[in-house]
Amino acid sequence: MSRADDDAVGVPPTCGGRSDEEERRIVPGPNPQDGAKDGAKATAVPREPDEAALAAMSNQELLALGGKLDGVRIAYKEPRWPVEGTKAEKRAERSVAVWLLLGGVFGLALLLIFLFWPWEFKAADGESDFIYSLTTPLYGLTFGLSILSIAIGAVLYQKRFIPEEISIQERHDGASREIDRKTVVANLTDAFEGSTIRRRKLIGLSFGVGMGAFGLGTLVAFAGGLIKNPWKPVVPTAEGKKAVLWTSGWTPRYQGETIYLARATGTEDGPPFIKMRPEDMDAGGMETVFPWRESDGDGTTVESHHKLQEIAMGIRNPVMLIRIKPSDLGRVVKRKGQESFNFGEFFAFTKVCSHLGCPSSLYEQQSYRILCPCHQSQFDALHFAKPIFGPAARALAQLPITIDTDGYLVANGDFVEPVGPAFWERTTT
């Protein structure tokens, strides 16, 4: 095979000469440039070797063949460190290893914070409240820094160790045949060998530690909710201890307990919650109310302050108290089995959306529509808060209410269904 024939199939100038055996394995076809000049001839590719010749090819031969089959010409390719083992190369290797190890450290920190950091809300008592408030920021900080550190390490490795290469490829169509798969594997193997990662034990170990810790922390963070038993009865109620998901601040702790519908005052120089009477609301209005007991106090003592904080922070506590206009009462449709849950013109629905637990906090007075701004679910307050638009599939849970002997609005029992989004064990629809 002549050098002219070798040039005709586009051998990259960096590949060098070939043995007679190699020349016999790759049989050239017509020159692609001639086909382009003629305009009538299709672009030709090298004739493919048979299976025996393909199996006998070395990785470098497969690499060269793959380039020619794909119409790839390597214009430039040089290693980053022509001389191995220099001090500069070692410094570059250590800098990459540092970033990868940092990724592992932050990934391990994410795992430890998720497992052991105090995440449950407790009433403010100085230092413990501050530690609790750091839980979510620390999740995001350690997760983000772990990803960032590994990414910086990967980018630095590419810039400092992967050979510099400029390749030019002609556009063409082709299917993934056996020969294509073998040559692609050869290219990947060449890239792996050229990256010199095999002999860089420190970087390999650092990468393994970084990705391992990051992956473990991420896996535990996502699977943690599936590992913990959510049905452990820990909340004392009038019917015995129950799991957290079955309860809220409106759940009576003993038979006959009075739980008032209280509005938040938003002031610091007075009680944070005050009881409500029917005359405190205008017709058509909406008020957010919270569960308040006489034993919760007015916040003047440390114990009372803690209890009131728990009321305000309870995720299933906020309730929308809506007063229907007398002229619109005839349009009200009550839910089956809940016909007595309202007190005259007053209806109380949870503020926790039945879609994903977001706060459905917007209310349109003229149409009696309740809107969750997160995913645009809408509920009709005239039709037992049934969803009429958006992804929510269930009505908002309704709280039974009445009035006590002193004329204050009180809960007439607990929610008869879980508050918020669905879960597997839920049977109500």
From Swiss-Prot:
Instruction: Give the PROSITE patterns listed for this entry.
Output: RIESKE
Major place of residence: membrane
Disulfide topology = 358-374
TM region(s), chain numbering: 96-116, 137-157, 207-227
Top-level taxon: Bacteria
For region Disordered, the annotated ranges are 1-45
> Does the record carry ATP-binding as a key word?
no
Record key words, sorted: 2Fe-2S, Cell membrane, Disulfide bond, Electron transport, Iron, Iron-sulfur, Membrane, Metal-binding, Oxidoreductase, Respiratory chain, Transmembrane, Transmembrane helix, Transport
Q: Which cofactor does it need?
A: [2Fe-2S] cluster
Q: Name one GO cellular component term.
A: plasma membrane
Q: How does it assemble?
A: The cytochrome bc1 complex is composed of a cytochrome b (QcrB), the Rieske iron-sulfur protein (QcrA) and a diheme cytochrome c (QcrC) subunit.
Q: What is this protein called?
A: Cytochrome bc1 complex Rieske iron-sulfur subunit
